[in-house]
Amino acid sequence: VTARSEYRTTRNLSLNISSYQLVEAVSNEYVIGLGYKFTEFNKVLKMKQTKDFSNDLTVRLDFSYRKSQSLIRKIEDNFTQPTSGNIAKTLQLSADYGLSKTLSLRAFYDLQINEPLVSSASYPTSNSNYGISLRFSLAQ
């Protein structure tokens, strides 16, 4: 079993002296990931076992939540206005199965959801990707 968690933050400030404005860009992101490795998964599939290779299945699940926004602070008027920003949620699920020393099979699903914080900037979108890949490795 593997587990991970991350917290990332960024903040950029830009001062414009001629217009008395401070532009602030802030981003906060949380990431949570889980993984599990099923050793000798071919026993579950009731397949013939090889002597020198263990057919392992590795499953991973990652979720991230990121909020980013840009603000214009007018120093002279003591006024703050959001100009852009969004909330991005990402879900990634993958399973890797070793068929042999050089051949592996991978299935994956990715989901990305973007929601704007400022309604005039954009509209909510979601993208999903899924698929199966077969990898052949020449290195041993």
Q: Over which residues does each language-model region extend?
A:
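Exposed, low-structure sequence patches enriched in small/polar residues
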Residues: V1-Q140
